[in-house]
Amino acid sequence: MRFFTCVAFAACLASPGLAQPQTAGGSLPSPDELSSRDTLTVAVGGAILPDYDGSDDYRIVPVGAIRGRYHGISFDTSGTYLYVNLVPAHGKLTFEAGPVAGMRFDTRKDIEDHIVKLLPHRHRAVELGAFAGIGLHGLTNPYDTLSLRVDAAHDIGNAHKSTVVGTTLSFSTPVSRKTYVSASTGAEFVSNKFADYYYGISPADSLATGGVLPIFDADGGMKDWKASLLVNQSITGDLLGGLSIFGMGQYSHLVGDFRRSPIVADRGSASQWLGAVGLAYTW
């Protein structure tokens, strides 16, 4: 739902409950059998991403993610956020709902731009909220998923102290018993408090940069839109279990006052690219 210091790829990892067409032995479990199966996927890798949301400087960071299901309760991490779905999945039309919790690490520390670095550091945001979604299965084969998710989380810490709302539309399908692909698009909506905290330039901020960054009052609204693609390829076994390799790419574009903010328009770019590669293991 957000821009993360850890790239958000866990939500795109192959879901052992719904994404596999066939086991290594050749049998064909039903989608309901797969959706009731306890499973755990752990992924580690490396990602390249901007220094801050709107920067044109990039860095390489380690990333990790988990996704699983236990007794009908599923969970996954997306960047630094944990989603827990409390609604068991059965049938062609499924629903999801549950809590989401995480942290936003966009603090302006350890960035390359020498002008933006002069601005005051930002606190880490601690965000708690909830999400809900709907999924439709079996559009092109019995194991694909078209899903829509909406989430909202509020900062309970000492950062932007506001609510962030995100939407994600995704389509995921196996193309063989060893290969899985997922494409998604989404948008994020934030408040005036969020916009001012991360993208506004106060008179004191402008003075701290020697006037290089002009005073700017940022308004909230739609912050950005994004699109991503992930491919997961089994190395051992199949998508039901074993070792796999994944690669993903994401493009996002800042809009409105977020694009016009001096830290983006003058010192960065509205176009943001993220990429990650790594290994995953499914039990």
Model-predicted segments: where are they?
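Cleavable N-terminal export/targeting peptides
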Residues: M1-S36, G268
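Short loop/turn motifs that connect adjacent beta-strands in outer-membrane beta-barrel proteins
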Residues: T23-D38, G54, I73-F95, H137-L146, ...
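Residues that define the transmembrane beta-barrel architecture of outer-membrane proteins
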Residues: D38, Y58-G64, L93, R122-L128, ...
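Transmembrane beta-strands of outer-membrane beta-barrel proteins
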Residues: D38-V44, G64, F75, F95-P99, ...
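Transmembrane beta-strand segments that form the barrel wall of outer-membrane beta-barrel proteins
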Residues: V42-P50, I73-Y83, D113-K117, T145-I156
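Residues on the lipid-exposed face of transmembrane beta-strands in outer-membrane beta-barrel proteins
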Residues: V44-I48, G64-Y70, L82-P88, A130-L136, ...
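Extracellular loop and loop/strand-boundary signature of outer-membrane beta-barrel proteins
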Residues: P50-Y52, V84-N85, H114-L119, A152-I156, ...
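Outer-membrane beta-barrel transmembrane domain signature
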Residues: I134, I156-S244, Y251-R260, V264, ...
